[in-house]
Every structure is written in C-alpha cells, then in structure tokens.
C-alpha cells in the first residue's frame, strides 16, 4: 500500500467510524445488548475454530523467537475464550449509562441544570499481542454507544480477523452499522501514525501494549490518550499483618500469572516483621522458580534463615516491570518508608497493604498515589472483570478523565443539560 493509498484508506475508515458513531449514540439499549449476546454465543459456538486459528499465530510467534510472556498474552486458551464470552454477557447485563441524567440542581433563576452521560464518539484502540482485546474493546465501545477503530498487532492478525468476523455477525443481527467496529486491515505501521493524528475523526486513543509502543504514542499522538506506561505494583507487609494472609496474598500477587500488568513486581516488608514474614514466603517463591532480587537487610534476614541463591537488587530493580518470575524485595522502616518508596518508584498502577490495623490501612489508601489501592487483597484483582465492569478497555494511571480499569463510564463524558420554562437572563 502506497503512502497515498494508506492515507486515503485511513481517511475512509475515519469517516465511516464518525458516521457510525452518530448511529451508535442513538442506538437502543436492547439493540446493543442483542449484538453483545449474539457475539458471545458465536464465540462459544466457534471456540474450536478460534483455537485453531490462534494456534497458527502462536506457532509463528514461537518461530520468530518471542518470549514466554509474549506467548502467554497471545494464546487463546479455553479459559480465555470462556472469559471473553462471559465478559460480553456481563456487559450486556450492565445498566446502560448513556442518556443518564444526574446532579440536577434548581437555580434561583428558575432553570434546572444537570449532567447527561454521552458517548465519547470514535475510539481508536492500538494493541499488540492480546487478541482478547478485540472483543473487550468492541464490547465496551458498543455498549457505551461509541464506534471503534481497532489496530491489533501483526503477530495476532489471524486471531483478530476471526474475532472481528464474529463481532460483525453480532452487529448485523442487531441492525447496527458494521462500521461501528472496524479492524484496520493493513499491518503497515504507518497506519498507526495516521490513526493517532486523525483529530478530525478520532476522539481518543487507547493503547494496549508494551512500554516502547506507549512511549512512541506519547511522543507522536495528537489525539488524546487513555493509557498507562508501566505496571510496577507493590505489596507492603505491615507490622500488624496477619502472616497467613500475607503469605497467601503475596504468593498470588506474584505467581498466579507473571505477564499481566497487575502482577506484583516489588515486595516491601516492615523491618519489625521481616524475620517472621520473609522465610515462609520466599520459600514458596524459590520452590516456584522465582528469582529474588533483595536489598542488604532482606539478604541478611534470609541468609540467617538458611536461604541461598539470592541476587543483590540494584537501584534500577525498584523501577522495573519484570513481567517474569523475578521479584524485587526491600525491607523498610515501617509505613512511612513504604509509602515513600511506592510514590517514588511505583507507576501509580496498583498497590496493596497487608495489615490488621484499620488506621494504618486507611492511611495507606489515602497517601499512596495510585489508580487502585488495596487492603489485604492481591494486586491481581486490579482488573475490569474483577471490579464488575464486565471487561476493561485498558488501565489508566493518569489522573484526568479515567483512572484505573476503564470500563463503560470511562468511555463516556458528561455534558450539561438545562431545562427551562422560558426563562431569560437579566
């Protein structure tokens, strides 16, 4: 595709998406739900076909030398397929936010002022090796009355194309415009450059991918973005922690899956409880093959308990998102030091405290400056499906518009509506 042809193609996609967004904004809840449920049924019906198509993408990725974390994100397992279908049904069951009027106020002038929830318009989704994003993005944009332009990675092209066909089937069944969900058909990277600068057609970009992709888009995009750059998540074990809870939560936060952005990457332990908390937990980590990168105080505690095979942590380790069986561990001087560490080195994604002290826990919630902050729970819960959003289109660690897992409401905005009886301003 020549540069001229690409520009013309992307312009056509943008124009069609803008036109479809107007139709989607007035689509009924019943029609949107009909489309979602049809897609869910089609995914279950074609599960074996989807796995066969996905297997070809996975085999190519392995041949190209992609690592285990990449392959994990790319693979459509039985569980992943079931989760996609369940997510569609959960989104269909959610209340439709579009048209909801809130914050009504009666003014002394006689007018009534409120806010109405409306779609954002056209949402561009750029993602790499996660074919499930095709469904999550289409579903959330559809239910929230938006149209969407999907640009998946070339490594998942067959999986994305197969899933997009099922989305088209659902739209047709509900009488909704096929252009409401469009997949960019070219793998030319210049298409991304055009998509992120089409301010006349695209209202927001949501990137789902690695750090290099997000960094590039932050430099080049003219369209606003909902994004997060890193998932450097922490769990802090407080002086007043229940040790059984601490071991269970911290084990899950790190080892349930290594690839997701809500996996714990740094464990912080209060010096007062380190000798009791670290040995049983680190024994589990080493049994599961997790490399432990430790500060000097943590090394001393673990070596006194008979541990070996530890790696000295560097300053860089506190800033790393490993997405692998590697964990940084730091012993800190209590709550103040833990909060300071998280706010200095963290990525404002998700952080958790293990404590039985209510005051300590509430202070952690207030002072840790992250999109999701937890007490006695695994960071792995920072997910749209687990939060009851049905699915998420992404996670934002920005502070404007949307923060944390972005579900339906994150894809809408509020406009002011005024009701009068002929009032004039004097």
Swiss-Prot record:
Single Gene Ontology BP annotation: L-proline biosynthetic process
Catalytic activity: L-glutamate 5-semialdehyde + phosphate + NADP(+) = L-glutamyl 5-phosphate + NADPH + H(+)
HAMAP family reported for this sequence: ProA
Pathway noted in the entry: Amino-acid biosynthesis; L-proline biosynthesis; L-glutamate 5-semialdehyde from L-glutamate: step 2/2
Keywords from the named record: Amino-acid biosynthesis, Cytoplasm, NADP, Oxidoreductase, Proline biosynthesis
A GO term, aspect molecular function: glutamate-5-semialdehyde dehydrogenase activity
Protein name according to UniProt: Gamma-glutamyl phosphate reductase
Role this protein plays: Catalyzes the NADPH-dependent reduction of L-glutamate 5-phosphate into L-glutamate 5-semialdehyde and phosphate. The product spontaneously undergoes cyclization to form 1-pyrroline-5-carboxylate.
Top-level taxonomic group: Bacteria
Matching InterPro entries: Ald_DH/histidinol_DH, Ald_DH_C, Ald_DH_N, Aldehyde_DH_dom, G-glutamylP_reductase_CS, Glu-5-SA_DH, GPR_dom
Family: Belongs to the gamma-glutamyl phosphate reductase family.
Protein EC: 1.2.1.41
Localization (cell): Cytoplasm
GO CC aspect terms: cytoplasm
Pfam families assigned: Aldedh
